[in-house]
Amino acid sequence: MLKLKGEFRTAKGLKDENKKQAQTLVFTDNQVEFKSNKQYHLRQLQQLKKKLLTLQQELEIRTQELQASYRSLLQYQSILEKQTSDLLVLHHHCKLKEDEVILYEEEMGSHSKNTGEKLHLAQEQLALAGDKIVSLERSLNLYRDKYQTSLSNIELLECQVKMLEEELSGLICQDPENKGDHSKVRIYTSPCMIQEHQETLKRLSEVWQKVSEQDDLIQELRNKLACSNSLVLEREEALIKLRADFASYTATHRHPPTSSEDCEDITKILKYLQEQKDSQCLHVEEYQNLVKDLRLELEAVSEQKKKIMKDMMKLELDLHGLREETSCVIEKKDKETVFLQYRLQDLQQQYTESQKLSLKKDKLLQDKDERLNELEKKLTQVQCLFLEKETELEKLQSTTKELDANLQEVRQSTSKIDNEGLRSEIQKLKESLEEAREQLRVSDQNLSQCKDEAHLSANNLEDAHRKLENCLLQDKRKDDVIKDLQSQLQKLQKESSETEEERKNNRQQLLELSSELNEGQRRLSSAEKEKSLLQKTLDEEEKKIDELLHGAKVSEQKQRELTNSLSKLQDELAETKRLLEEKREQLRKSKDQEKALEEEIEALRQESKKKEKMAKEQLRKLEEEKENLQAELSSCSSQLDSSINKYNNSQKVIQELNTEIARQKDSIMILQTQLDSAIQKEKNCFQNMVSKETYEELLRKSGTCQDDLTQALEKLTQATSETKSLQRNLQQTQERKAQLEDEIMAYEERMKKLNMELKKLQGFQQQSELEVHNFDKKLEEMGNQVLQWQRQHQSDLKMLAAKETQLREFQEEMTALKENLLADEKEPSLMPSKPAPKENYRHHRENDQIMCNVEQWAKEQKLANEKLGNKLREQVKYIAKLTGEKDHLHNVMAHLQQENKKLKNEIEEKKLKAGTPRICAKVLGPCKLEPSQKGKLCGALGWRGVCQDPLPKMDLTKYTGVPHCSGSSYC
């Protein structure tokens, strides 16, 4: 449009010059020439009118194009305002994300504290397990000693029983009245034992009822807990859904639609701008001063840009150093993990060896149980022999009564000579009886020793069972320790993998930065090429300007348009300054984030060091436990050797006793022969009368013999009662063994359940770790987005530099046009009239080309702004998604913490249940049973709370020796 106006003015100047020439020709030339000139001027006027019409049409077209370009510029301004608002929203979201990251770090710190407390608890449990293993081993040794002593006592009792049987077979004559007394004694002992047994059964049933009631209460409480946990989970899921809906709603309803009022405001602004076009020409000089100020500010911005680039280089160097440090730390961790794996393998081998030893011990116990069964069978046989001996004793008593009657008859017929022989024989019998009494005393002492040894064997058996339980608990705790170490190894491996992934990400970032640097260099080279092209175009335009010297008025219009463009560019510069300030703030935030990441890396290093120390301490404790176990094994082996020696000694003693028993049998046989000879002599002397003195002496001797027989019978009853008590102890030990086996099975099932729960916990922890890993990846993606924003900032700076170059070019054009105007004013225009239309046509073409270039530039800027707007919207949506996912992660972590608390509570409840056997022992303390029986009953209860079958009814006839009579008063 400016060029057209300039051409119009040049045409008017040409008209004036032609008029002046015509006037000069009128005054100088003839009228003929005046007519020819008139015709020529008329033709020129017609041509000029046609040109004016064409110029007016072109002016209208150009005005319409200018209006369209102005509208597009207003649209661009609105788009830029929206982009600034979106950038502010993004800035706010970044602040929120930083706050959320801080909260997440605090949560991770609390989680690490909880894990440390769990490790401490596990160590305490390991120490308790070690103590229990020691006690179990001691109890095992005691049980073994008791078992061996019981075997020796049983053998001694068998020997004593044989001795007594032989003595009873020697005693022939006694009263038949003693039969009923012995049966009464035997029957008297059995109902007392039955009553005590019934009382213990009643107490056991009451205790089991209480335990079952407590189990029902615990199950009800667990059901209530499960219901409350399900309600909490449902509410948490509803909260997560509401948060996601709110985030999507905020993301969708952030940009309100434009209204018709905005369009009306735009039309008003357009009218106002059209009115102020003429007034803005005067303010060109002021704008030039402003342009100078802007140049200074741009130089300052470029200096700041250089400083920022220097800071970025420093940060890259710091990153290189950090990567090297992380690589060193990863290598150390790899070495430590290998060392821990070797240690784990050693511990597993030790564990397998301990299992083998326990299997061997179980086999030995089974062998001992088989021996006990054999001994029980032998005892039953001995009892049968006792019954036979009792019948023989009764027969002997009847024979003694007959002998007394015969003696009374013989007293009347025996002589003094026979009496003297009988006296000598009776003295011999007395001596033999005294020897038998001494042997009985020795046997009583041996019986008391056997009783003491039986008590010791029972105590040793109880200690052995306790040691077995402690060993089993220690093995289980060792399994738990091995599993904990394996989980720690897995965690260390995961951490090493995470560090390797961080290294890979850092390498990728370095590659991206290097690619960005290469792209920047390429862009610089392309910018230099564009500069050269622009210089060429400038040269061409200068040539054109030389040709357009006559278009001074057109240049003035161009100045006005340039002032308008300068004002617009100033507005754009202001907006770019705002963008620069915002991006500087973003850079500062990114630096703060980098500092926070460095602090996190240091914290992770400290945590890794702490974990290493904890692992070393645990390994030391395990080594100490191993040494203690080895020492205990050595002590157990020494105790076993001593018990074997004792067993050999007891066997020797038994052999000696057997020899003594054989000797006593021989002496009894001799006495029997003597008695037979005495009976024959009495029969021979029956015919002869015996004096009163000999008769009285014989009566005395028979009374002493009867007393000796009664004492022997009492000793026999004591021996039978002791054998019965030993049999009861054996039955109780067998029942105790069965109960212990049931408890061991229950413990194994409980351990399996606990292992399953631990596996579930490990799965939950792995899921939480994966979610944390995904969240870290998302944080890295956010960092990459920050880097992209930095790149966009750099590209914006480059765009500003390009605009500065365009401003400089426009200013140079302005100065050149001013100089041309001054030159035109000084020099007179002596151009011919004919070539004017050609120059005007050339001006039109150049103006059209310039307008096309401006339109293309405007379209390119519009497309670039639209792309930026789309990118910003996508970033906003992505940030909304990240917030939703972060809330979901937070909820998942809270849920996992609740589940961990629940599992802790369940473990504490199980520990409390494990304390119930002690309570049961206190309840059953005041029982009337023997001390060994009390301990066995308390141990038989266990902590499982499972009712066991009552003891089987014993056939008392086997032990009492009473026949199953239908009509007797004793049945």
Curated annotation (Swiss-Prot):
Keyword Coiled coil: yes
GO process annotations (BP): cytoskeleton organization; gene expression; protein localization; protein-containing complex assembly; regulation of protein localization; spermatid development; spermatogenesis
Chief place of localization: other
Keywords: Cell projection, Cilium, Coiled coil, Flagellum
Assigned GO CC terms: cytoplasm; outer dense fiber; sperm flagellum; sperm head; sperm head-tail coupling apparatus
InterPro entries, sorted: PMF1-bd (IPR037391)
Known tissue expression: Expressed in testis and more specifically in ODF, the sperm tail specific cytoskeletal structure. Also expressed in epididymides and brain.
Subcellular location: Cell projection, Cilium, Flagellum
Coiled coil regions, renumbered to chain: 37-69, 117-229, 282-325, 355-680, 706-827, 879-916
Function: Required for normal spermatogenesis. It functions as a scaffold protein that attaches the sperm head-tail connecting piece to the nuclear envelope, thus maintaining sperm head and tail integrity. May also be involved in the general organization of cellular cytoskeleton.
Protein name according to UniProt: Polyamine-modulated factor 1-binding protein 1
Taxonomic placement: Eukaryota, Metazoa, Chordata, Craniata, Vertebrata
